[in-house]
Each structure stands twice: as C-alpha cells, then as structure tokens.
Design a protein with these regions (language model features):
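N-terminal active-site segment of His-dependent metallophosphoesterases
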Residues: 1-56
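Beta-strand-turn-beta hairpins that frame and shape the catalytic cleft
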Residues: 1-4, 100-107, 151-155
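N-terminal start-of-chain detector that recognizes signal peptides
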Residues: 3-5, 29-30, 109-111, 127-131, ...
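Active-site neighborhood of phospho(di)ester-bond hydrolases with catalytic His/Asp-centered motifs
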Residues: 6-7, 31-36, 57-62, 107-108, ...
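Active-site environment of divalent metal-dependent phosphoester hydrolases
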Residues: 10-15, 39-42, 65-69, 113-115, ...
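Short amphipathic alpha-helical segments
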Residues: 17-18, 44-46, 71-72, 119-120, ...
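Active-site neighborhood of divalent metal-dependent phosphoester bond hydrolases
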Residues: 47-108, 114-137
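Conserved beta-sheet core of the metallophosphoesterase superfamily
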Residues: 121-168
Length: 168
C-alpha cells in the first residue's frame, strides 16, 4: 500500500489541499502526518478535521504538545498558541501518539519519545544507534528540512515541511 507521508503542516490548509489534490496523493491508501499539524498557519482546525476525515495517522508534534500545556511555554509565539487553541476548541489532540511503529519503521516527530528534540543529518548515526535492533528506518519531521541518510544498515528520512517551508 502506498503511503502519503507529510510533516509540519502548521495550520496551512492551502498547502494541505494542494498536496491532497495531486494524483500521487490520491493514489495513496494511507496518510501519515508526523506532527505539528497546527499553529502558525490560520487554519489549524481545517487541517486537523481534514486529516481525521481521511483517517490519517497523526503524531504528536511539539506544537500539539505546547497546546496541551500552554502555561509551560512563555516563548515568542505564546499569543499564537492561544489563537490556535481557540480555533481548535472542542477538538482533542491529547490522544495523538508520539511514536508509531509500522513494520521495521519507527515514525516520530523529533526523535523517538521526544517531539521537541531536533535532529540533523550529522547527529543521525548516534540517534540511529539508540534504536531497537529491529528498527531499520527512522522517519521524522520537526526541523522542516528534507533529508535522507543511511548509516550502516539503517536509514533515516525527513520529508521536510508540508506547510512552513524554511528553505526558500
């Protein structure tokens, strides 16, 4: 079964709609979003509702976590978190998993067990060495950069950001 894999949509419903309208996306039997479905973009509710309507597997990203615990975060986007929380009134994000296993693949937002931890290609050999022996593929998002790295018998992949591209 083909899988549509995306990360870091960040409330950008226009970007999600554009992705879903492609023939490639329409031929996929499964949809997975690696976290940060919400915040920054103006339509977090539409993003979450659309993904749920599609039966997508959604992971917990750091922005969903921040919405669940807003008082723990007094950073630069505190006000934006409050606006996003208002948009999502009545929608629960607390049940989103941090990690998902599919066969020998481990999917996560940041690093396994931690949606806040950023990982970059130079750090991947160390991160991959901490995985259970039966995991051969790590798929993560969070840093908005697309990369594909092999280290030994393991591979790590990041699809980049679907809704908040920071690479130009």
């Amino acid at each position: 079964m083909r899988t549509l894999l995306m990360a870091d949509i960040h409330g950008n419903f226009a970007a999600l709609r554009a992705i879903l309208s492609t023939p490639e996306a329409q031929s996929c039997g499964r949809v997975i979003s690696l976290g940060d479905q919400v915040n920054f973009g103006p339509e977090s509710r539409k993003v979450v509702e659309t993904l749920r309507l599609l039966g997508a597997t959604m992971l917990m990203g750091n922005h969903e976590e921040r919405l669940l615990h807003p008082d723990d975060f007094a950073g630069y986007n505190w006000a934006m978190l409050r606006v996003t929380a208002g948009q999502l009134s009545g929608i629960s994000l607390a049940d989103l998993p941090v990690d998902v296993r599919i066969g020998s693949a481990l999917l996560t937002h940041g690093t396994p067990g931690d949606p806040y931890h950023l990982v970059y290609p130079p750090d991947l050999p160390e991160v991959l060495n901490t995985l259970p022996e039966d995991v051969s593929l790590l798929i993560s998002g969070h840093n908005h950069l697309c990369w594909d790295v092999t280290s030994g018998h393991r591979r790590a992949f990041n699809p980049g950001s679907a809704g908040l591209n920071e690479t130009g």
